[in-house]
Amino acid sequence: MDNLKILLRLYRQYTKMDLLWFLRDTRYCLLQIVSDTICACCTIAGVFLLSEKFGGFGGMNQAEILFMMGFSTLVDGIYMMFFIGNNTAMISRIIGRGQLDHVMIQPVPIWAELLAQGFSPLSGSSMLICGIGLTTYAVSRLPISVTMPWLMLLLIYALSATALIISFMTLLSCAAFYAPAAAEEIAQVGKDLFTSLKTYPLGTMSHSVRRLFLTVLPVGMAAWFPSALLLKAGCGEFGLPMLLQACYLPTAAFALSLLTIYVFKKGMKYYAVNGSPRYSGFGHR
């Protein structure tokens, strides 16, 4: 309970800091918000135009693809709001640049600081708003029964997909403990993998490709897989096989999170002994 109070206090402080940025430098804050909105539109534009041209593809029609893109933007919005500030999601930069000590000297648990320092409820909310709006519009075009259990499933899948992306990026970032200069930007590579591929439907791809994108490279679990399950659940297709599939994403996200925590702790032990090679007599980079 004490740790939860610490986390909530940190969220409150970072909310104040984000609001102060907006009040003191409104022009640049609005520029970032508008830029994020444009990026959200550009991310989904390619797939949307393909679906308009061919009337849908990958085993989905236009409305279903629009829903998948809305879900994808919703996941990106959660990611942006909670992890975009202070390079939190790009933690390989923090590790690689020798800036992890900035987090470690804070008088709070390191996990709480890492969870809270990226929170940007004002400047980072534009993509989340776009995701909510696009998902709502897509649902209005589909024969889906929107109930409270369905909305809860949507929320669980969105949070699970976000946790999966963050865990995957952090797992890659652990390489920066051992090769700081070479792996400084590896988190961006992981993010680009999801950004470029997660909005494509995988329904008509071969089983081997789908297994690859649902296991080793889990880009399919960030948008296509949960969207397909939500569409089936909204149409009342919820038998025992569907129930087993429905548990896959939260279970995979939880398992990957545990693996990431284990590997990150191993990296922290290495860091405690060796420190950062990027320190010098003039300080660190």
Which role does the model predict for each range below?
Residues D2-R285:
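Hydrophobic transmembrane alpha-helices and immediately adjacent juxtamembrane helices
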